[in-house]
Amino acid sequence: LGDVYKRQFQICSQCDPKKDTILFIDPGFPVQRQQVRILGIKHESFDIYDFRAEKLGPKLESYLKQGNVAAIIYSNPNNPAWICLTESELRTIGELATKYDTIVLEDLAYMGMDFRKELGHPFKAPFQATAARYTDNYVLMISGSKIFSYAGQRIAIAAISDKLRNRFYPALKERYGICLLYTSPSPRD
């Protein structure tokens, strides 16, 4: 997933010139923050531990209302702390991402490993908790190599909402000659 993270950070921080910061909800993977530093992208962070449940919304909004946050990244479930965000916390993240037009980078490297409920039956409830139920501004980053315990193999997926994938970004058009977030040039070129 390392390269997937790097690309998401880079693209998200270039969509809107006013939004140049990645917000980390910690604990997270140190390599993600290192990638942001290497790329020269501004970042902020807060630790989820003291801001669970109803405290999450005000804390998250205190960053988003500044208008400079391009993306929010968190791991759910989280390793090594194994913190799992609740459905209401994910709703808060999704709704605020929509309100402030911020992209949610949901790290699902350990998808299905929330052992509070049985998630091991494909196409049957309960399903993986995700902020994608509450916003169209999401990229789900999934690691098949971790989920399926592939020793040595690296398989990753970036699942992007259709609305986000097809969104027009003038800053990307100006910089790269493409106007969409994750596709080749469109007829709007």
Feature names for model-found ranges:
Residues 50-121:
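Active-site phosphate-binding strand-loop segment of PLP-dependent enzymes
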Residues 133-184:
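Conserved core segment of the aminotransferase class I/II
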Residues 3-21:
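Phosphate-binding glycine-rich loop
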Residues 106, 119-145:
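Conserved active-site segment immediately N-terminal to the catalytic lysine
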Residues 24-41:
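Substrate-binding/gating loop at the entrance of the active-site cleft, primarily
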Residues 1-8, 182-189:
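Conserved small/polar residues in nucleotide/adenosyl-binding loops
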